Amino acid sequence: MAMWRSSDSMVYLPPPSVAKVVNTDDYVTRTGIYYYAGSSRLLTVGHPYFKVGMNGGRKQDIPKVSAYQYRVFRVTLPDPNKFSIPDASLYNPETQRLVWACVGVEVGRGQPLGVGISGHPLYNRQDDTENSPFSSTTNKDSRDNVSVDYKQTQLCIIGCVPAIGEHWGKGKACKPNNVSTGDCPPLELVNTPIEDGDMIDTGYGAMDFGALQETKSEVPLDICQSICKYPDYLQMSADVYGDSMFFCLRREQLFARHFWNRGGMVGDAIPAQLYIKGTDIRANPGSSVYCPSPSGSMVTSDSQLFNKPYWLHKAQGHNNGICWHNQLFLTVVDTTRSTNFTLSTSIESSIPSTYDPSKFKEYTRHVEEYDLQFIFQLCTVTLTTDVMSYIHTMNSSILDNWNFAVAPPPSASLVDTYRYLQSAAITCQKDAPAPEKKDPYDGLKFWNVDLREKFSLELDQFPLGRKFLLQARVRRRPTIGPRKRPAASTSSSSATKHKRKRVSK
C-alpha cells in the first residue's frame, strides 16, 4: 500500500529585500563652478612626551605636541544655499539645494625633515637577546635608560565624518570569580573615532598601554599611559555610505633595531617538552618574553606624500566627495618631520664662563606647521520624493539643516487651549524652549579650521587653483594689456602662377 509523506528536504525562502545604497552621483548634479579655499599657516608648539603643568595658575599648561599624534582638522565650510552665487539661474531654491563636493586637496607641511626619538629612563630591558653571552635569571630591577626612533608613518584620510580607529583594550572575563590576581587580562578590540592628539601606532602595537601595562616601563614615556590607535581601514572601506573615507594616502616603514627580553616573572611558563634542562647558569631558562626596539630608518624627500596636490575623481565608497553638513574631516600623520628642539637656559643671571651642568636647565619642545588648500565644486540636489526619502534614511539631520521636517502623526487626544493667557488665575502658559541643536561630535577633540569666509572664484590667484586649471586644461584669459587679434583667414586657393615664355633670340 502506497503512503504519501512530506519531503524531508528544507524549503528555503528568498531573503527579504534590502534597500539599495546608491552613489551620490546618481542624485547629485555637478555644475561647472569651482571655488578655492585655503587656511592660514597653522602652528602648534608643545612638549613631545607629556603635558607640562604650570604652577601658580597664571600661565596655561604646556600641551603635549608630538609628531606621533594624529592631527584631525575639522574644516567648516560656508552654507552654499546662503552663498552669493554668480549665476542666479543655476538652481531653483524651491525644488533644489546646493552642496559642496571636494575635488582637490593639498596638505602643506613646513619645517625640515628630521628624526625624533622617544624613550624611557626606566625602560624594562633585561638582556640583549641578540648578542648576550648568558641570560639573567634574577628578578632584580634591570630597567635602563633607553631611547628609540619610532616607526615612520605618513597618513592622510579625508571624509565628511571622523575617521574610525581601532585598538586592543582590557576586556571583561566571562567568569570574574575564577580570575585570580596576576592573571593575564582578556583582550577586546575597541573601535573609537580618531581625535586630534591621539597617539598613533609607533611600532609597539595598537593597544591601551595604561590599562594593559601596569609596570609603566614597557614602552617609552609618551605612550606608557596612552592609547595608541590604528585606522580601521576594513571598517571604513565597508562603510555603507562611504562618508568616513573618500580616499586615503598612507606610507609605513619599520624595522627592528635591537632585541631584548622583559624583566619580571614569566606568566606563561615554557612547556617542558620544548627544551632540555641545562646545568649551572643554564639550569633555569631566562625570560621568554621578547620584544624588539622599533626603528623607522632613513627619512628622505623622495618618499613624501605631502606638499603635492591630489584630485578626487572617484571615491572608494558611495560618497564621491560630497561634504554633508558643510564640513570635512582631514586626518593627518607625518613622522618625517619629528625633530625635537633642545633648549638650555642658565639658572643664574649671567651665563657662567665655565661649564657646570648643575647651572643649566635643559628643555625639549616640538613644533608643527601645516597649510591646508582645497578645491570645491558646486553641486545641486533635486528634492524629489525618492531623493528626500533616501537622504532622510541616510541622515535625517541633513534635511533638518535644509529646513525640511517630517510632519508628526495626527494626535487623537484633545488639546487644552486657554482664552486669557496672561491671567493670574491659570497656570503659566509659556512655551517650552526649543531644544538647541546638539553637535553630534560634542566631547571629541578636533583642530577647528573655519573656511566660511575664505572661498574665492579666482582660482588663478592661488597655487592649488593654478594647478587645478593646468590639469583641467583650462586656458586663462588675459586680464590686462592688449589682446591679440585673431589672424586673418587665408584662402584655400593658391595664387595663380605665371608661366615664363621662352623667347628665341
From Swiss-Prot:
Q: Which InterPro entries match?
A: Capsid_L1_Papillomavir, Capsid_L1_sf_Papillomavir, dsDNA_vir_gr_I_capsid
* One Pfam family cited in the UniProt record for this chain: Late_protein_L1
Instruction: Quote the cellular component terms of the Gene Ontology held in the record.
Output: host cell nucleus; T=7 icosahedral viral capsid
> Keyword set for this entry?
Capsid protein, Disulfide bond, Host nucleus, Host-virus interaction, Late protein, T=7 icosahedral capsid protein, Viral attachment to host cell, Viral penetration into host cytoplasm, Virion, Virus endocytosis by host, Virus entry into host cell
Q: Where is this region: Disordered?
A: 118-143, 475-505
Basic residues compositional bias, start-end: 475-486, 496-505
Q: Does the keyword Oxidoreductase apply?
A: no
Q: Where in the cell is it found?
A: Virion; Host nucleus
One GO BP on record is: endocytosis involved in viral entry into host cell
The subunit field of the Swiss-Prot or TrEMBL record says: Self-assembles into homopentamers. The capsid has an icosahedral symmetry and consists of 72 capsomers, with each capsomer being a pentamer of L1. Interacts with the minor capsid protein L2; this interaction is necessary for viral genome encapsidation. Interacts with protein E2; this interaction enhances E2-dependent replication and transcription activation.
Q: Which family does it belong to?
A: Belongs to the papillomaviridae L1 protein family.
The identity of this protein, by name, is: Major capsid protein L1
Q: Which species is this UniProt entry from?
A: Human papillomavirus 39
Gene name linked to the record: L1
